[in-house]
Structures are given as structure tokens and as C-alpha cells.
Amino acid sequence: GFIMEFAENLILRRMEDPK
């Protein structure tokens, strides 16, 4: 789906860039 991909992208970005 679209929402799932969007959420996954956000999570991946947050995990890669923890601040």
C-alpha cells in the first residue's frame, strides 16, 4: 500500500538519523 511504504520510509530515515 501507500501508507505502509510512507511509514516505513519515515521509520528507516529516523533509525538512520537518530537525533
UniProtKB/Swiss-Prot annotation:
Q: What class of enzyme is it?
A: translocase
Gene Ontology CC annotation, any one: mitochondrial inner membrane
Membrane topology field: Peripheral membrane protein
Instruction: Give the location in the cell.
Output: Mitochondrion inner membrane
Q: Which UniProt keywords apply?
A: Membrane, Mitochondrion, Mitochondrion inner membrane, NAD, Oxidoreductase, Translocase, Ubiquinone
Per its record, the protein catalyses: a ubiquinone + NADH + 5 H(+)(in) = a ubiquinol + NAD(+) + 4 H(+)(out)
Q: Which Pfam families is this protein grouped with? A: NDUFB11
Where would you say this protein principally sits, based on its record?
mitochondrion
- EC number of the protein: 7.1.1.2
Give the GO molecular function terms: NADH dehydrogenase (ubiquinone) activity
- Output the superkingdom of the source species: Eukaryota
Function field: Transfer of electrons from NADH to the respiratory chain. The immediate electron acceptor for the enzyme is believed to be ubiquinone.
Q: How does it assemble?
A: Complex I is composed of about 30 different subunits.
- Name of the molecule in the record: NADH-ubiquinone oxidoreductase 11 kDa subunit
Q: Which organism's genome codes for this protein?
A: Solanum tuberosum (Potato)
- Which classification does the entry list for the species? Eukaryota, Viridiplantae, Streptophyta, Embryophyta, Tracheophyta
